[in-house]
Amino acid sequence: MVIELAELKNFAKIFLTGIYENLERIIFGSGRYTSLEMRNAILTGTVKIPKTVIEELCIGCEGCANVCPTKAIEMIPIEPVKITDNYVKDKIPKINPEKCVYCLYCHDFCPVFSVFNEISPIHPRDVGEEYIEIDISKLLQKKIEISEEQINKISSLLSINLRRIIKD
């Protein structure tokens, strides 16, 4: 992996700003955001990154990768898994925690909530159960009713996003 000098400078600036702004909380464990356990993990470099994608639940639609503003999600090929008669999953998302800014666009866009595995407006990181069993084939076989108005709104939003992606 080749890192350009500008990217390295930008990363260093963000890193140093973060340390400076959070120094008291990191060292003394003060404030409500950093517990003693988290402080020790930060200082020793042993912070565990939580599992963000439930691979068994994912349908491999690539929506999360397409919507990610930092391109932190890469679709990794897997052995094909038949989900329905007409659909086979052949890749799953892998999130790069160094690029991810936890904007949760992927979570909001995922049709089965396999990214961060939470259906809620609160930040899902480290919240709730680690694993929920769901039969994906039943989810995809259920008929979805969408009004004409909703279809028009969705197609309008998609066309705006496609234009933005093409410009990038």
Curated annotation (Swiss-Prot):
N-terminal signal peptide: none
Q: Which domain of life is it from?
A: Archaea
Q: Please list the residue ranges annotated as the 4Fe-4S ferredoxin-type domain.
A: 48-78, 91-122
Q: Which GO terms describe its molecular function?
A: 4 iron, 4 sulfur cluster binding; metal ion binding; oxidoreductase activity
InterPro entries xref list? 4Fe4S_Fe-S-bd, 4Fe4S_Fe_S_CS, Fe-S_Ferredoxin
Q: Does the keyword DNA-binding apply?
A: no
* Record: residues binding [4Fe-4S] cluster: C58, C61, C64, C68, C100, C103, C106, C110
Quote the PROSITE patterns the UniProt record gives: 4FE4S_FER_1 (PS00198), 4FE4S_FER_2 (PS51379)
The record's annotation in Pfam families points to: Fer4_7
Q: Mind listing the UniProt keywords for this protein, alphabetically?
A: 4Fe-4S, Electron transport, Iron, Iron-sulfur, Metal-binding, Repeat, Transport
Query: Which cysteine pairs make disulfide bonds?
Result: none
Q: Which PANTHER family does the record match to this protein?
A: 4FE-4S FERREDOXIN-TYPE DOMAIN-CONTAINING PROTEIN, ADENYLYLSULFATE REDUCTASE, BETA SUBUNIT
Q: Which NCBIfam families match?
A: PRK06273.1
- Tell me what this protein is called: Uncharacterized polyferredoxin-like protein MJ1302
Q: Which organism is it from?
A: Methanocaldococcus jannaschii (strain ATCC 43067 / DSM 2661 / JAL-1 / JCM 10045 / NBRC 100440)
